Regions:
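Metzincin-family zinc-dependent endopeptidase catalytic domain
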Residues: 1-101, 113
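The catalytic-center signature of Zn2+-dependent metalloproteases
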Residues: 85-149
Length: 149
């Protein structure tokens, strides 16, 4: 629950967005491992990664099954709000979207890939796709998560 302000160097003026990869890298450098299992960063700024117009979040994905390593992810809540699109606020929907995106990115930190099942790990390229997916893992993804414990 530590706060870390964004830096000017992480901002892309041409895109009017923050570089999610730079922010996540700095967040992870500033984390003291202690007894942490995973790190979830939450930012209220518009973010991008690579050539994508925007992302709801990004994650460090383990290449090998290393349970001792600390992995993290970052989600942006900016585009999850209806107000971003000039619509009336809906706090219940905002909370549901935030939960789904947090679970999705945290799933990646446990090595889960995008899933075609009815699953929170289904890729979302729009808010409608986020709204349409459930807030839980399918049986296959749930088994993979449980194998880490």
């Amino acid at each position: 629950q530590n706060s870390l302000p964004v830096k000017e160097s992480e901002y892309n003026h041409e895109r009017d967005q923050y570089n999610a990869s730079l922010i996540l890298r700095r967040v992870m450098k500033n984390i003291q491992k202690n007894d942490l299992l995973r790190v979830l960063g939450i930012i209220d700024e518009d973010i991008f990664s690579g050539n994508l117009n925007f992302v709801f979040g990004i994650a460090q994905i383990p290449k090998f099954r290393n349970l001792d390593a600390l992995f993290g992810c970052l989600i942006s809540i900016t585009r999850l709000r209806r107000e971003f699109y000039g619509r009336q606020a809906n706090i219940k929907l905002f909370k549901e979207r935030t939960l789904k995106e947090a679970m999705h990115e945290l799933g990646h930190t446990f090595g889960l890939k995008h899933c075609q099942n009815v699953c929170v790990m289904r890729f979302s390229n729009s808010l409608q796709e986020t709204d349409d997916k459930p807030s839980n893992f399918c049986k296959e993804c749930q088994k993979q998560i449980e194998s880490h414990f």
